[in-house]
Amino acid sequence: MSYLFTSESVSEGHPDKVADQISDSIIDHFLAFDPQSKVACEALVTTGQVILAGEVKSKTYLDVQKIARNTINKIGYTKGEYMFDGNSCGVLSTIHEQSEDINRGVDKATPEAQGAGDQGIMFGYATNETENYMPLALELSHRILKELAALRREDKAIRYLRPDSKSQVTIEYSDDNVPLRIDSVVISTQHDPFLADEKAMLNTIEKDLKTILIPRVVAKLPQSIQVLFNDNINYHINPTGKFVIGGPHGDTGLTGRKIIVDTYGGKGAHGGGAFSGKDPSKVDRSAAYAMRYIAKNMVAAGLCDEILVQVSYAIGVAEPMGVYVNTYGTAHVSLIDGDIAKKITELIDLKPAAIEKRLKLRAPIYLETAAYGHMGRTNRTVEKKFEQPNGESKLMNVELFTWEKLDLVPAIKTAFNL
């Protein structure tokens, strides 16, 4: 019997994502000037106000207020009528020095002995139902909002869009977990009050999103996914009515509140730890990336069609407490999942320092992760510029989304005789 599965996404202008991007922009600036910085940075955004809090151990000094303002402006909050914009909002920072009690557990005599920054469990997931080994409902939800943001920035085909938006996609699956069709799509987008007649305004928004946005999204999809779109999709466009008041003025945003959007859209599992605002000594972040790296490479190597990988750590201890694997009965090798987990520990070093080194996590690569998902993104190298209050600037080429590389596939094929 078929079933329905749903995932959601939120845009870069969603209040929680504004907070995530501010936190990760600050992380990037610390790492750009001192790669060994230890940083935990939380942000709260609300009407006309940003509050920063956290703990830092670093050799560099930053103008965090300026970084926050620049990030807000880049997202698109640049007008006073939004009641939250980068030029006029207040920015209060209470960031202070990291606790020595915590630092003692992380810093060791040799980098290899670096302990985990906290206890916790982290998961990685991958499936072969999309080309980037991500769950389809989440992938489509992200793509809808990325295309909507592109339309907003182009300011041509649709000229009334504001930064805050959300999407949700429901897919019908067969009883053997094959996507059959898209059942429903929900899109809520903030907009200017461009017509006095609210009904006419909402009709215009619905028409534009169905006839401009959706065709642009579909055109960029593989043919195997395009065929899932049909004339019977149940669309809900701004179902509550007008959405003029939005962003941090409409809802308070906090760092780390969109952890399911950030990962797998409800597929697989989540250990509960957020990513944004944390340097890579925090295994909530680094180990979750490592688990995705392992899971994606396992599926790409043909070991299985779907996999969930878990790792656990104790604070101050380098070696993981354990590794767990679930292939959901899709493995193409004659090994039980426990044996696959054991081979993983032989295949890759999961100590925090080894993860940081392998995935190049001590680089300023995190702002780009803070919207539209940390997983399933395109591995690429970009040029980024960073500035200090004293006028010093640094231009860097950094490699983004290293955990999406498939360079572990040959070793997996050898280890499992694939």
Give each language-model segment a name.
Residues 6, 48, 66, 73-77, ...:
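Glycine-rich, mobile lid/loop segments that gate access to catalytic sites or pores
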Residues 37-41, 165-171, 233-237, 303-314:
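A short glycine-rich, hydrophobically flanked beta-strand micro-motif that places a catalytic Asp/Glu
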Residues 12-31, 129-148, 278-302:
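Alpha-helical support elements that line or immediately flank enzyme active sites
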Residues 1-40, 45, 155, 409, ...:
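N-terminal, positively charged regions that mediate nucleic acid binding
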Residues 8-10, 14-19, 114-130, 244-269, ...:
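Conserved phosphate/anionic-ligand binding catalytic regions in large, soluble enzymes, centered on
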Residues 46, 306, 313-418:
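Internal helix-turn-beta structural module
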Residues 196-300:
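Glycine-rich anion/phosphate-binding loop at the beta-strand->alpha-helix junction
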Residues 39-59, 315-319:
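Short, charge-patterned binding micro-sites
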